[in-house]
Curated annotation (Swiss-Prot):
Keywords: Capsid protein, Helical capsid protein, Virion. One of its GO terms (molecular function) is structural molecule activity. Residues 1-10 have a biased composition (Polar residues). Its main location: virion. This is Capsid protein. It comes from the Viruses. It is found in: Virion. It comes from Botrytis virus X (isolate Botrytis cinerea/New Zealand/Howitt/2006) (BOTV-X). GO terms for cellular component: helical viral capsid. Residues 16-28 have a biased composition (Acidic residues). Required for genome encapsidation. Residues 1-54 are annotated as: Disordered.
């Protein structure tokens, strides 16, 4: 078999559908190639051994992943689609071998998720693109925002795929997976994240210039003022490479996952070396944890969306899949004009469903707190409280 693939080598949509449908009933065994057959065939049996497919085939599979050729209604069908492509080209091997080989040339990792969608594949391509730009970002350039990047990569991927179909050359498609789109070409179309660069581990944030906005300052009594925030940040000891602002934002991101109540026990350490517990102690000297975090709410919101990391306890708190990014208790500050503004605004505004879900959750928690007033179950105590018209306690709210 000629290892150089052309357009005729790739299966059509109809052929893939037919192959997949039949594979779901009884997967056909791919044809054996000469190199697949062991020399010892004295008993007339043919045993299969793994042979690594050529780069051209792997690139073709990667191209189909990136371009959305295999959109994938579910993970099983997606697996069978890839297997069908290998069978069409005449190569054997189980799906795990295919995935390991594809990793070398296409998305890293090939998603081990129960559902695989084109948008998710594009998002991973975009994140890989951001990782490759880390060196440039450290020099002061800014990464594209997630939504704009996905849109740009999607358009570039589709254009490259259309061209590959015409020319029969699928090799350039793999560059979409590894390099994404030209940042200079799309720089005017993408948003900056508050003059920040974000590394792939999702924890390290570094301001590259102008750590606090110089524009007109709006203040709110529900969040810390810029002066208060700076006074707190001046107390944070950091390493030479990390600014106090970075540590402060990392603390706010941690609070989005752990909570910003005065009762929260903060775990973890900032990249500057200060523990979040110590930062929390500095914050409490000037304002509440929630007021401090609210100042960085918009930056935290952009960060959660960029890294596709909703607050970890969103399901526990009753949020739905569509409202999960609103599951942190200072979410209401995302729409507050007094919060630290990203340079080009939010990646996206909160949806009405997210706002409703957060407000409902806040209302339920406040009511539960107000009703949780029984310190004794004795008959005398409960009767006395009932006779007095109920226990009167201070009213609390999100501004605590």
């Amino acid at each position: 078999m000629d290892p150089n693939l052309d357009q005729d080598t790739l299966p059509t949509h109809e052929e893939i559908d037919n192959d997949v449908d039949s594979a779901e009933e009884e997967p056909p065994e791919p044809p054996l190639l000469p190199d697949d057959i062991d020399d010892d065939d004295s008993h007339g049996s043919r045993t299969r051994r793994q042979v690594k497919p050529p780069p051209e085939l792997l690139r073709a599979v990667g191209a189909c992943l990136i371009s959305g050729h295999y959109d994938g209604g579910n993970y099983f069908r997606w697996q069978q689609s890839i297997a069908a492509l290998y069978a069409k080209a005449g190569y054997a091997g189980d799906i795990r071998f295919h995935q390991a080989a594809i990793q070398e040339y296409a998305l890293d990792p090939v998603l081990p998720a129960p559902r695989v969608s084109y948008d998710l594949l594009v998002a991973h391509a975009g994140l890989r693109y951001q990782a490759l730009l880390n060196e440039q970002l450290r020099t002061g350039k800014t990464p594209p925002a997630d939504e704009a990047l996905k849109d740009a990569v999607r358009k570039a991927a589709q254009a490259a795929y259309d061209n590959a179909v015409k020319t029969g050359d699928y090799t350039p498609l793999i560059d979409i997976a590894f390099k994404g789109v030209d940042i200079n070409k799309h720089a005017s179309d993408v948003a900056q994240l508050a003059k920040m660069s974000v590394t792939m581990d999702g924890t390290h944030i570094k301001f590259t210039a102008g750590e606090m906005p110089k524009d007109k300052v709006i203040t709110s009594n529900s969040m810390a003022s810029p002066n208060t925030v700076m006074n707190i940040l001046n107390l944070i000891t950091t390493s030479a490479n990390v600014t106090a602002v970075t540590c402060g934002i990392e603390f706010a991101i941690a609070c989005a996952h752990q909570g910003s109540s005065r009762y929260t026990r903060h775990t973890g350490t900032s990249t500057g070396g200060s523990t979040f517990e110590l930062i929390a102690a500095h914050v409490k000297e000037h304002c509440t944890i929630r007021q401090f975090c609210s100042y960085f709410a918009k930056v935290v919101w952009n960060h959660l969306l960029t890294h596709a990391t909703p607050p970890v306890n969103w399901a526990k708190h009753g949020f739905t899949l569509d409202s999960r990014y609103a599951a942190f208790d200072f979410f209401d500050a995302v729409t507050n004009a007094a919060a630290l503004p990203p340079k080009n605004g939010l990646i996206r505004a909160p949806t009405s469903e997210e706002i409703r879900a957060h407000n409902l959750n806040a209302h339920l928690l406040i009511n539960a707190s107000r009703q949780d007033d029984q310190v004794s179950s004795s008959a005398q105590y409960t009767a006395a409280i009932a006779q007095a018209g109920g226990f009167k306690r201070p009213q609390i709210g999100w501004g605590e």
